[in-house]
Structures are given as C-alpha cells and as structure tokens.
Amino acid sequence: MFLLGVSAVTATYLIIQDRKSKNVNKNNDEEEEMPACTVVFVVGAPGTGKGTQCEMLVKKTADEWTHLSTGDLLRAERQRVKDASEKNNSNSNSDTEDLSLGQQIEDCINAGKLVPSSITVQLLEKGMHQAYQQNNKCTQFLLDGFPRGQDNIDAWEKLCGQKHTVVAVLNYDCPEEVLVGRLLERGKNSGRSDDNMATIRKRFQTHVEACKPVLEKYGTEGLLYNIDADRSKEEVFKQTYEIVQKIKK
C-alpha cells in the first residue's frame, strides 16, 4: 500500500510539473513578439483563382510561405463569436479580447456596413502572429484578397507599414465574361447565393473600381506583377512560381 501511495504521489507530482512546464512554454510563446515579416499581397477579382494559386505555392515551396485569406479570416472570426455565444464561454481576458474583434466584425456585417480597414488589418496581423507561432516561425506571408482599396492601403501602412515589408503585389487579371462563366459554374455546386449573374457582375465592377489605387500605387513602386489568369491553373502557376522565385533573389 505504501509503495502504491508513493507511486501515486510521484505520478501526481510529475503530472503537475508537466502542466507547469507546458503553461510556462505556452506563456513564453504567447509573449514572443513576431519579427518583421516579408509580405506578398495577392489581388484579383472573384473567380480568378488567386486562392488556388496561393495554395499551390505553399505546397510547392514546402511551407516556406503561409497563405492567409482575408475572407476566410473574417468568416472564421465571425464563427468564433457565434460558437462562444452558444457555449457562453468567454471568461479569460485573451478570449474576451479575441471575441471583441469578432463582435465588431459581426456588428458591421449585420448592420450592412463594410468592415473597417483598421479591423481587417488587425485581423490579418493576428492571423500572421498565430501562424508564426504554429508554423515553424514562418515569416513569409501571402495575403490573399488584400488590399482591396485605398482604405486598406492606408490602414496597413499605419498599423503594419513600419514593421513588415511588402515585396510584391500579384494581380490576377481575367476578362469579365470568363469570370462570369467560372462563377456560374461554381454556383451550380457551391450553393452560394452570390454566384448569380447580377451579383457576379456587380462584384467584378466593384473590384475593378476599388483596386485602381492599389494597382497604381504598387505599379509606380515597381512591386506590381500582372498575371494572366485566363489560362489553365498549371500555366498560371508556372508564371506565379517564377515571379516568387525572382522576388527571393
């Protein structure tokens, strides 16, 4: 009985020490500041396949790059708010802070307003920091769907411009009629309500107008790379990969 008791005490002690060690490591990770990162902005109208190209690039380069989609981050943050609301679980300060950002996004969308650029940039930097902690300290990022206009540019330069370096802007260009065909085909399987003719054309025109200052600014700075997306994804990727390899040199 005594030996059993000692074993139990020893086991309990080891478990406690292990938990303490994990907590210390966790706190160290949380406190570790993300260094300056290399950033590539990836823009293009809906249906150009820019997200697919980012995924192919991550795979080809063995995770040298991390792909962050603005749209995916926004949707994930909204879902966190919904999940937390259902579970009524927002006790810790860090969770409350995270949910606060998501709640602001949810409030904007519910009110039919655009999410402020400052919130979008905060969300991107949060995603970068999380990816840095979880993905072997990766410091090279493909920001998919950003920037979408002058407001995005201004917010990025104000909040991140002094720290992270934008080395290129990949602009995937494709004729409107080709994109309409692609998105209508996608709509047959996706069930997305925004994959209809009227909405697709409106989204395309909105993108063209909003993206003008983005293309002008980075074109003037020599950072813009226009990529013809009216080809097979393999042909498009060949050009994408060549550009990224050129950037690295």
List where the protein language model places each region.
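Glycine-rich phosphate-binding loop of ATP-dependent small-molecule kinases
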Residues: 1-249
